[in-house]
């Protein structure tokens, strides 16, 4: 999934950003020629729905959503497909699934946007598309040949949970595209939801007679 940072970033600069946020073509996809190679994406211009931040900053903020989406899918077929096939999958996924869905949902002239669909921080564009793609990949590949699963290293789990929890502040609060009340509400909701879910998971482990563990608290926090 680390390769998603390299492949998707380059693809984003080349054409994917234009496909997502360029002038709308039928409300389905953007015109890639408008912002090809980031033409017109400068620090002196701004996206129409984010007038308080530079266009270049907005473009790279959105790039992080595009990067994380195929990375989320990786777990469904990790170690079961060839490396080059995975790279090809990422390119095709971004161009033919992520870009149209992003444009229709987040572009003011997009089809879903015009219908009133609200996706504040990627519930549809990121998580739904990644979930369905992962499910399709898992069904196509079938069960793993090796069923043995090595125990997770709790140190890495704790570190990953902390990074993920903190990183979600950027995704959720940052989606307000400004230092404003909406960003504060998103940050507060993210914090309380993760904390409450982590605590609830620990309590339910205790009630059900399971061993209370840091692993359970981490799983609960991520679920929240």
Predicted regions and their residues:
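Hydrophobic alpha-helical transmembrane bundles of multi-pass membrane proteins
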Residues: 1-224
């Amino acid at each position: 999934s680390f390769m998603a940072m390299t492949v998707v970033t380059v693809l984003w600069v080349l054409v994917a950003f234009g496909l997502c946020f360029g002038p709308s073509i039928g409300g389905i996809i953007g015109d890639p020629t408008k912002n090809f190679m980031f033409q017109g994406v400068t620090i002196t211009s701004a996206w129409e729905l984010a007038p308080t931040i530079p266009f270049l900053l907005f473009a790279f903020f959105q790039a992080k959503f595009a990067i994380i989406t195929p990375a989320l899918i990786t777990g469904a077929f990790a170690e079961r497909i060839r490396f080059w096939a995975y790279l090809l999958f990422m390119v095709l996924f971004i161009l033919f699934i992520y870009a149209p869905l992003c444009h229709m949902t987040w572009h003011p002239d997009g089809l879903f946007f015009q219908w009133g669909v609200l996706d504040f921080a990627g519930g549809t564009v990121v998580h739904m598309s990644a979930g369905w793609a992962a499910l399709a990949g898992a069904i196509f590949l079938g069960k793993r040949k090796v069923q043995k699963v090595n125990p997770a290293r709790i140190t890495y789990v704790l570190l990953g949970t902390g990074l993920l929890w903190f990183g979600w502040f950027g995704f959720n609060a940052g989606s307000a595209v400004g230092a404003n009340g909406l960003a504060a509400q998103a940050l507060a909701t993210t914090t309380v939801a993760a904390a409450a879910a982590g605590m609830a998971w620990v309590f339910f482990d205790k009630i059900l007679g399971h061993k209370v563990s840091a692993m359970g608290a981490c799983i609960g926090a991520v679920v929240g």
